[in-house]
Amino acid sequence: MKNYEIAAMDKKELLSKIKELENRLADLNFYQAIEPAQNPMVFRNLKRDIARMKTRLTQIDRQEKSNA
């Protein structure tokens, strides 16, 4: 997911997308125990997307606190 796509999301969308990606990562980790992944870069990309979204969520929280 691109940074501009993440920046366009609001807080609720970010929270739901983070939860969705974390569930997907957990599923992939489970299936990796059974059978090795064909593309190991999927894990790295998912973790990076989750980190980007959490960073954006923190930025939104800080903006809300400074505006309040």
UniProtKB/Swiss-Prot annotation:
Organism: Chlorobaculum tepidum (strain ATCC 49652 / DSM 12025 / NBRC 103806 / TLS)
Family of this protein: Belongs to the universal ribosomal protein uL29 family.
Keywords linked to the UniProt accession: Ribonucleoprotein, Ribosomal protein
Classification via Gene3D superfamilies: 1.10.287.310
The protein's name: Large ribosomal subunit protein uL29
InterPro entries: Ribosomal_uL29 (IPR001854), Ribosomal_uL29_CS (IPR018254), Ribosomal_uL29_sf (IPR036049)
Pfam family, one: Ribosomal_L29
GO molecular function: structural constituent of ribosome
Biological processes annotated in GO: translation
GO cellular component entries: ribonucleoprotein complex; ribosome
